[in-house]
């Protein structure tokens, strides 16, 4: 029990203890919100690589196999002990998306038939990977099944972090052409939403670069250390589109169940 002369200190101490005991509590609450409370989710611990890893190829070669092995083992456990032959959605962001692609490349036919969709967010999927892996099927709309959703958001093409992705879709209007879509949302997850003015942004897919061009974004606190770049919105790929992603997961799941 923590006592204090002021409620503010008690709250601050409670938050500090919560962060130390449950370091990923905020992230898991965010995932729970993304799933609308209508789906269960399985999010195992794994030995995640630091941002420093991606500054040198030799670091990636040495460290990523450890993370990949952890997630593969966790997915096998999920299928054997938890899933019970039910439909499922795969979702990963950045490093998690890279590893998720490894799961797709090894997935057997029976498991794939139960996969509603895969969301590989904030990663590039090369053409040769798509050609090699029949389980990676590019999403073409809002409700297709067994597909992979992928996108990367930037101010313009010069801000890209990765090479062109062969799989890309606009998560606001769920189109793969250049049709623009209006996105209105709070610009940053670092402040309470009630304290923010919403940005009105225009999002369109640039077919030549395979990137989402975002006009009208006001935040300045998005640049990642070590690997980030001004005008690249990698750290906000889920935050900006969270409402669209939530609705889309629910739609794809409903369509999948309707077709069974």
Question: At which residue positions do the language-model features occur?
Answer:
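Surface cap/lid and interfacial helix-loop subdomains adjacent to catalytic sites
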Residues: 70-84, 105-255, 259-260
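Structural recognition of the beta-strand scaffold that forms the well-ordered cores
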Residues: 1-2, 40-45, 89-90, 117-120, ...
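Short, well-ordered amphipathic alpha-helices
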Residues: 28, 99-106
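Extracytoplasmic/secreted cell-surface and envelope-processing proteins
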Residues: 10-12, 53, 98-100, 127-131, ...
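An acidic- and aromatic-residue-enriched active-site/binding cleft used to recognize and process polar
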Residues: 46-49, 93-95, 120-124
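Gly/Ala-rich beta-loop-alpha elbow adjacent to hydrolase catalytic centers
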Residues: 90-100
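Active-site catalytic motif of lipid deacylating hydrolases and related acyltransferases
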Residues: 2-86, 219-260
């Amino acid at each position: 029990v923590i006592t204090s002369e002021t409620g503010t200190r008690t709250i601050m101490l409670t938050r500090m203890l919560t962060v130390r005991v449950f370091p990923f509590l905020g992230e898991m609450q965010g995932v729970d919100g993304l799933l609308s409370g209508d789906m269960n989710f399985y999010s195992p611990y794994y030995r995640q690589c630091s941002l420093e890893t991606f500054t040198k190829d030799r670091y990636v070669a040495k460290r990523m196999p450890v993370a990949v092995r952890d997630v593969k083992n966790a997915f096998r456990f999920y299928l054997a002990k938890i899933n019970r032959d039910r439909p499922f959605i795969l979702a990963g962001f950045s490093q998690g998306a890279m590893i998720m692609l490894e799961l797709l490349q090894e997935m057997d036919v029976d498991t794939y038939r139960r996969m509603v969709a895969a969301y590989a967010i904030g990663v590039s999927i090369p053409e040769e990977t798509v050609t090699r892996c029949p389980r990676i099927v590019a999403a073409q709309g809002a409700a297709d099944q067994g597909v992979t959703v992928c996108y990367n958001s930037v101010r313009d093409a010069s801000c890209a972090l990765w090479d062109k992705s062969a799989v890309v879709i606009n998560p606001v209007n769920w189109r793969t052409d250049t049709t623009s879509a209006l996105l209105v949302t709070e610009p940053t997850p670092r402040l309470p939403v009630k304290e923010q003015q919403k940005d009105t942004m225009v999002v369109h897919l640039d077919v030549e670069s395979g990137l989402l061009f975002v006009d009208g974004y006001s935040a300045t606190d998005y640049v990642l250390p070590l690997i980030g770049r001004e005008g690249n919105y990698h750290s906000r790929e889920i935050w900006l589109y969270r409402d669209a992603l939530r609705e889309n997961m629910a739609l794809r799941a409903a369509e999948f169940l309707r077709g069974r």
